[in-house]
């Protein structure tokens, strides 16, 4: 759980984010992967009373983006410079379904089964050095301390 005082405000969604619960964050040379896991049945997938995992991960992703941006601005995360400008930390949103997954695809969110996860992450080319990867990971671990 991450709590924010003052809340992080997402203007686009009109949402004051006071806290988020993050299932998993994978930090690797390929970027940062925000992973929400769901062990849902077919009935759960069709249940309109359950909160949308897509909305949930997009909300959490915005908070994670703001945390990482703060680390770069405050020089807690020092990425190798590039003569074109500031480099970004890609955050990729993944919902992993253990049992059933929906057939639909969603904007800014990849929906996978557990078996598909490894190949999806391996698909991306490295954008960070070993040192940068370690720095990002240490920064995120320090936020939770």
Outline where the language-model segments fall.
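Surface-exposed interaction regions that form or flank ligand-binding interfaces
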Residues: 1-20, 41-47, 51, 55-145
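Active-site beta-strand-loop-beta-strand hairpin of nuclease catalytic cores
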Residues: 17, 26-42
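Phosphate-centric recognition/catalysis
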Residues: 23
């Amino acid at each position: 759980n991450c709590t924010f005082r003052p809340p992080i405000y997402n203007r686009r969604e009109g949402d004051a984010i006071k806290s988020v619960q993050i299932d998993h964050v994978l930090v690797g040379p390929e970027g940062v992967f925000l992973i929400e896991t769901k062990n849902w049945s077919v009935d759960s997938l069709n249940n309109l009373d359950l909160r949308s995992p897509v909305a949930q991960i997009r909300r959490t992703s915005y908070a994670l983006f703001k945390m990482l941006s703060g680390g770069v601005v405050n020089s807690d995360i020092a990425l190798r410079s590039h003569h074109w400008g500031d480099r970004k930390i890609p955050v990729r949103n993944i919902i992993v379904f253990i049992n059933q997954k929906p057939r639909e695809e969603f904007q800014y969110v990849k929906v996978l089964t557990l078996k598909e996860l490894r190949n999806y992450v391996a698909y991306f080319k490295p954008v960070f050095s070993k040192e940068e990867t370690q720095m990002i990971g240490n920064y995120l671990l320090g936020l939770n301390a």
